[in-house]
A protein has these predicted regions:
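Charge-dense, helix-prone N-terminal extensions
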Residues: 1-123
Length: 123
């Protein structure tokens, strides 16, 4: 089980990452992980859900693979159809897997110079 503290520690351990509003993490001005904004009531505003992360992935097709791998951890909703992000249940994900998922997401958004200089052992 991962915690918000694990997310913050892992994300801020990645080079040039900053924390933005609503527990979102950014590199080079690009978000790679943020809190899922859930719609509690139909036609109402979405509100951040502290138990679920939205994490950037390479391609939308990756969603199906992740969901099949572990549907207790990974899921999606219609709001994310056509968008390269997967939803992650914090209570269900192992911190080591969370580290891999966040590092992969960071690599997708980080500029080439950071990717080239980054060693996973640094995180």
């Amino acid at each position: 089980m991962a915690t918000p503290e694990d997310v913050r520690r892992i994300a801020l351990g990645l080079p040039e990452t900053t924390e933005g509003p609503d527990f979102g993490f950014v590199v080079d001005g690009k978000a790679f992980v943020w809190l899922w904004r859930e719609r509690i009531e139909p036609k109402s505003a979405r509100v951040p859900n502290p138990d679920v992360l939205a994490v950037r992935i390479a391609h939308e097709s990756e969603k199906e693979t992740l969901i099949e791998m572990d549907p207790a951890v990974f899921f999606t909703e219609p709001h994310y159809d056509g968008y390269p992000a997967i939803l992650v249940r914090l209570a269900a994900i192992d911190p080591a897997l969370l580290g891999k998922v966040l590092t992969d997401a960071w690599r997708l958004r980080a500029p080439r110079r950071l990717n080239a200089a980054f060693s996973p052992d640094e995180a």
